[in-house]
From Swiss-Prot:
Gene3D superfamilies: Mitochondrial carrier domain (1.50.40.10). Belongs to the mitochondrial carrier (TC 2.A.29) family. The gene is Slc25a28. The chain crosses the membrane at residues 72-91, 133-152, 170-189, 227-246, 261-280, 327-346. It holds the Pfam family Mito_carr. It is found in: Mitochondrion inner membrane. The lineage of its organism: Eukaryota, Metazoa, Chordata, Craniata, Vertebrata. It comes from Mus musculus (Mouse). It catalyses: Fe(2+)(in) = Fe(2+)(out). Mitochondrial iron transporter that mediates iron uptake. Probably required for heme synthesis of hemoproteins and Fe-S cluster assembly in non-erythroid cells. It is a multi-pass membrane protein. The keyword Magnesium does not apply. This is Mitoferrin-2. GO terms for cellular component: mitochondrial inner membrane; mitochondrion. Residues 1-28 are annotated as: Disordered.
Length: 364
């Protein structure tokens, strides 16, 4: 429908009301018009007549560009919900990935593919065995993803304004993703250590507190961050590839950057698959550092494995070049729906929260 431009006295023809539109919707559209005209399409002063503005009442304005809607709190809440849901839904596959990355697995824990692994784990170890350690993962994922998305959105906008004013910069997207990863991994690394030790075959830990206590007493507090540098070495390129691929695909499938669930799912899934396959060798080394796999240690290594270089040498000594790609199938299968869930849930909650904030402001 066509809505006349606003003058100093109001919208010509009355408020942005129409048949079938509630007072709240009318107030919301009225607020959008007021902000748009106040700025002036051609840089004119507020109060000058503006040409007719066409708005699609179904989609509204570009939700990512609302001037005061998407606050840091919005990104943090949306990111926390997305992170928790992502990890909870995909946790059984993550358990399989950890086991398939084992360098010298027990004969009872040698799996041909993801489905066989899940079936055998549930049949021989119990229906809920693939979910062991989920509670500590969810506890870490909430704050980690809140920091992650809030930092990413803030830096993406700041760097894009510097590198490519008025446009979108792939370099800014990649750099923002890298910096956001520093905060995410700092919050998530201890939970990763505990989670992966509980996921291993014949793990002696049945409760999170048992695992935390044993690691603290036997290896010290530093064990919770032993894999931090390797995690960063893996996640920084992973997130750079991930964010750059996602934003690149969004430019093609959703150039107007409106809330579009199908584009968020598709772009997130593709970005996750590409990034996961490219960084699998680093993920194998991270798993070794987190678990300190006893069979690998007993074979030809003494003491604890510390640092990325040591992990790379150990992986090669035990399994050769092919060992760097153990679990690549499970990792890609995990990341495709995982990143699709994360982006779609994050964008949905960002859209929902922003819309509610705008409705509240318009009704004041």
């Amino acid at each position: 429908m066509e809505l006349e431009g606003r003058s100093a006295g109001g919208v010509a023809g009355g408020p942005a009301a129409g048949p079938g539109r509630s007072p709240g919707e009318s107030a919301l559209l009225d607020g959008w018009l007021q902000r748009g005209v106040g700025r002036g399409a051609g840089g004119g002063e507020a109060g000058a007549y503006q040409p007719p503005v066409r708005l699609d009442p179904e989609s509204g304005p570009e939700y990512e560009a609302l001037p005061a809607g998407a606050t840091v709190t919005t990104h943090m809440v949306a990111g926390a919900v997305a992170g928790i849901l992502e990890h909870c839904v995909m946790y059984p596959i993550d358990c399989v990935k950890t086991r398939m990355q084992s360098l010298q697995p027990d004969p009872a824990a040698r799996y041909r593919n993801v489905l066989e692994a899940l079936w055998r784990i549930m049949r021989t170890e119990g229906l809920w065995r693939p979910m062991r350690g989920l509670n500590v993962t969810a506890t870490g994922a909430g704050p980690a993803h809140a920091l992650y998305f809030a930092c990413y959105e803030k830096l993406k906008k700041t760097l894009s304004d510097v590198i490519h004013p008025g446009g979108n910069s792939h370099i800014a997207n990649g750099a923002a993703g890298c910096v956001a990863t520093l905060l995410h991994d700092a919050a998530m690394n201890p939970a990763e250590v505990v989670k992966q030790r509980m996921q291993m075959y014949n793990s002696p830990y049945h409760r999170v507190t048992d695992c935390v206590r044993a690691v603290w007493q036997n290896e010290g507090a530093g064990a919770f961050y032993r894999s931090y540098t390797t995690q960063l070495t893996m996640n920084v390129p992973f997130q750079a590839i991930h964010f750059m691929t996602y934003e690149f695909l969004q430019e093609h499938f959703n150039p107007q950057r409106r809330y579009n669930p199908s584009s968020h799912v598709l772009c997130g899934a593709c970005a996750g698959a590409v990034a996961a396959a490219a960084t699998t060798p680093l993920d194998v080394c991270k798993t070794l550092l987190n678990t300190q796999e006893s069979l690998a240690l007993n074979s030809n290594i003494t003491g604890h494995i510390t640092g990325m270089a040591s992990a790379f040498r150990t992986v090669y000594q035990v399994g050769g070049v092919t060992a760097y790609f153990r679990g690549v199938q499970a990792r890609v299968i995990y990341q495709i729906p995982s990143t699709a869930i994360a982006w779609s849930v994050y964008e949905f909650f960002k859209y929902l929260i922003t819309k509610r904030q705008e409705e509240w402001r318009a009704g004041k």
